[in-house]
Amino acid sequence: MAKQTTLDEFNAVFPKLEEVLLDHARSYKLPQEQLDWYKKSLEANPLGGKCNRGMSVPDSVSLLLEKPLTEEQYFQAATLGWMTELLQAFFLVSDDIMDSSITRRGQPCWYRQEGVGMIAINDAFMLEMAIYTLLKKYFRTHPAYVDLIELFHETTFQTELGQLCDLLTAPEDNVNLDNFSLEKYSFIVIYKTAYYSFYLPVALALHQLNLATPSNLKQAEDILIPLGEYFQIQDDYLDNFGKPEHIGKIGTDIKDNKCSWLVNQALAVATPEQRKILEENYGRKDDAKELVVKKLYDDLKLEQLYLDYEEKVVGQIRERIANIDESGGLKKTVFEAFLAKIYKRSK
């Protein structure tokens, strides 16, 4: 029987990895003040999140093996998981600067913390490099070492392409709904979110077990990318229709001029008059204008449109899962676990 990891088990691996990273920096005779800074960044940025991406690696390895992991297997899987969390930290530190964000996980964003400022850009680079330090330390002799390096490079670049498309499509200070389209939306969510959040953890698990055949990777990608797209569309839906007490935050997509699924669906069906309402009210930091857009979303019955979309896409994903070829070591349960976590979630 496979066994799910807990956040406590997963977090317990980090101090050992942190020590490896600090030792690596020490090997260059980095002065103590700068070493302390690196330690502070390593503790402020990768830690404190839900670790869904990172924990998906040991969970997937256990499902692939259909049994609980040995101590060594767990350590390897959790180390790969922490690399996804370091990748996420690198993206978030950078993203918060680009978006001029204020808070992250209930704290001021790293670049807004005392004395940090634009040093955060270099800290982000160092978080990215930590991935490759850990890969070399623990996977140098693994048959998939080069594949793992290439997977992280490829996933990083894919995420950066998604981010570029997002930044150029929806600048916060320049509202132009002509920039938006469902094709662009789909590109942004697939590249900015789906690859690193959904495909990467399973690809890492397959590589750890030497099961990353072209067929297994392709089958995983064909399910996990649509799953990641569904997850982001659900996020956009919850931003407007979710209850703040459930999702833990107040939605800001309308005020932030986000290229969200809802605004794209609205643009696709709006009359010229309704489009004019959107153009005059979307992306404005104004409560009254936000309410006008919310009312338009209700008038256009976007909630029902989402619920219909959800049933359709989940049906397609379930069909793909049912048709998985398990002869090469892939397991349907890996994908069922992902779907179960997000289907009909309220936060």
Swiss-Prot record:
Q: Which UniProt keywords apply?
A: Lipid biosynthesis, Lipid metabolism, Magnesium, Metal-binding, Steroid biosynthesis, Steroid metabolism, Sterol biosynthesis, Sterol metabolism, Transferase
Q: How is the cofactor bound?
A: Binds 2 Mg(2+) ions per subunit.
Query: Which cofactor names does the annotation list?
Result: Mg(2+)
User: Enzyme group, top EC level?
Assistant: transferase
Sites where the protein binds isopentenyl diphosphate: K50, R53, Q88, R105
Decide whether keyword Lipid metabolism is in the record: yes
Q: Which InterPro entries match?
A: FPS1-like, Isoprenoid_synthase_dom_sf, Polyprenyl_synt, Polyprenyl_synt_CS
Does the UniProt entry include the keyword Lipid biosynthesis? Answer: yes
According to the UniProt entry, what is the EC number of this protein?
2.5.1.10, 2.5.1.1
Q: Which reaction does it catalyse?
A: isopentenyl diphosphate + dimethylallyl diphosphate = (2E)-geranyl diphosphate + diphosphate; isopentenyl diphosphate + (2E)-geranyl diphosphate = (2E,6E)-farnesyl diphosphate + diphosphate
Q: A GO molecular function for this record?
A: metal ion binding
Which residues make up the binding site for Mg(2+) 1? D95, D99
Pathway listed for it is:
Isoprenoid biosynthesis; farnesyl diphosphate biosynthesis; farnesyl diphosphate from geranyl diphosphate and isopentenyl diphosphate: step 1/1; Isoprenoid biosynthesis; geranyl diphosphate biosynthesis; geranyl diphosphate from dimethylallyl diphosphate and isopentenyl diphosphate: step 1/1
Please give the GO cellular component terms listed in this UniProt entry. cytoplasm
Q: Which residues bind dimethylallyl diphosphate?
A: R104, K192, T193, Q232, K249, K258
Enumerate the residues binding Mg(2+) 2.
Answer: D95, D99
> One biological process GO term for this chain?
farnesyl diphosphate biosynthetic process
Family per similarity comment: Belongs to the FPP/GGPP synthase family.
What does the function comment of this entry state?
A: Farnesyl pyrophosphate synthase; part of the second module of ergosterol biosynthesis pathway that includes the middle steps of the pathway. ERG20 catalyzes the sequential condensation of isopentenyl pyrophosphate with dimethylallyl pyrophosphate, and then with the resultant geranylpyrophosphate to the ultimate product farnesyl pyrophosphate. The second module is carried out in the vacuole and involves the formation of farnesyl diphosphate, which is also an important intermediate in the biosynthesis of ubiquinone, dolichol, heme and prenylated proteins.
Query: What protein is this chain from?
Result: Farnesyl pyrophosphate synthase ERG20
Q: Which organism is it from?
A: Gibberella zeae (strain ATCC MYA-4620 / CBS 123657 / FGSC 9075 / NRRL 31084 / PH-1)
Recall the taxonomic lineage recorded for the source organism: Eukaryota, Fungi, Dikarya, Ascomycota, Pezizomycotina
